[in-house]
């Protein structure tokens, strides 16, 4: 409670479920869907995410991210907000803009006092982790935000417990979220 746990808000970083391989997919990367195994992963993960009761769902507009949160969106009747700056291409072109878009989600989460789930791609997650490590209240927390790829396995999430301080947002705890069975 000393760190402000009673006032902490949750922000869930979700890595999309297993997608079709880039090699075998003939369409655009933005339209690359999740596999049947990925659909099972997403279904199982969404049951775990529901335990955090995310009332705001945000996602890269790319299909595999949307498909990962789709069941949760349908079951909770909550819309998904598409954030263009969180696509792989947008991050590759303008990583600072991607961080600002993600940082805005942190601000909205703290201001609205609602749990947010954000589905993103591996390289984008790595870039966000680079910034998030600096927001961690303790070094041991920062170490949980892995500094090398793949950062997180597909179809898993990290729950960040964030408080608002006079110096800005501070991450006071991190929990890994992964389905037991899929």
Question: Where do the language-model regions lie?
Answer:
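Short, solvent-exposed aromatic-acidic interface loops
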Residues: 172-182
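Active-site-adjacent alpha-helix immediately C-terminal to a catalytic or transition-state-stabilizing loop
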Residues: 103-168
